Amino acid sequence: MELVLKDAQSALEVSETTFGRDFNEALVHQVVVAYAANARQGTRAQKTRAEVIGSGKKPWRQKGTGRARAGTVKGPIWRGGGVTFAAKAQDHSQKVNKKMYRGALKSIFSELVRQDRLIVVESFSVEAPKTKELKAKLAEMNLEDVLIVTPEIDENLFLAARNLYKVDVRDVAGIDPVSLIAFNKVLVTADAVKQIEEMLG
């Protein structure tokens, strides 16, 4: 299959297995959920009554004081006592096989092509790290909410995009399923397309 280059009167021959496969919604969903879960830190800590530091002595005798009976000052109803169901650190990570991850990315790229959300250009860069220059360049292409994918990070382009809320610049190694879905358009250079094909097989 061919992808038409937006800035040149030519087309790029690409693999149908990477850019022309059926959309596997279940697989993409599983990989996106796993990606989000793996980003969770999971660090939290509260103490149970057993972990609270304090005396194990009964605070007052059982009978005769007129007060409610109490056996410990570390119980959850006491100020400074333990928490009933104390939150503990958790590992939320989910394992995703490489084959599944690559399959999900192929599925997403294929769907982007079908929805005309993937824009391929011969090259894309800015002269200086100026947001104004990048904004004008994107406006010419009628792009506002866009992920720009290049073979490697262009420092000028990266710095120019840093202050734009709906624009992000990634190299091929830095793309992930969530970013590809999150942006309205994905702008990819011809060299980056070749790298993507090599990466996804």
From Swiss-Prot:
UniProt entry keywords in alphabetical sequence: Ribonucleoprotein, Ribosomal protein, RNA-binding, rRNA-binding
Disordered: annotated segments: 46-71
Keyword Ribosomal protein attributed: yes
One CC-aspect GO term: ribonucleoprotein complex
Family annotation (Gene3D superfamilies): 3.40.1370.10
InterPro entries noted in UniProt: Ribosomal_uL4 (IPR002136), Ribosomal_uL4-like (IPR013005), Ribosomal_uL4_dom_sf (IPR023574)
GO molecular function: rRNA binding; structural constituent of ribosome
Short name of any one Pfam family annotated for the protein: Ribosomal_L4
Stretches assigned to coiled coil: none
GO biological process, one term: translation
Role of this protein: One of the primary rRNA binding proteins, this protein initially binds near the 5'-end of the 23S rRNA. It is important during the early stages of 50S assembly. It makes multiple contacts with different domains of the 23S rRNA in the assembled 50S subunit and ribosome. Forms part of the polypeptide exit tunnel.
Subunit structure as annotated in this protein's UniProt entry: Part of the 50S ribosomal subunit.
Family: Belongs to the universal ribosomal protein uL4 family.
NCBIfam families xrefs: rplD_bact
Protein name, as recorded: Large ribosomal subunit protein uL4
Native species: Shewanella sediminis (strain HAW-EB3)
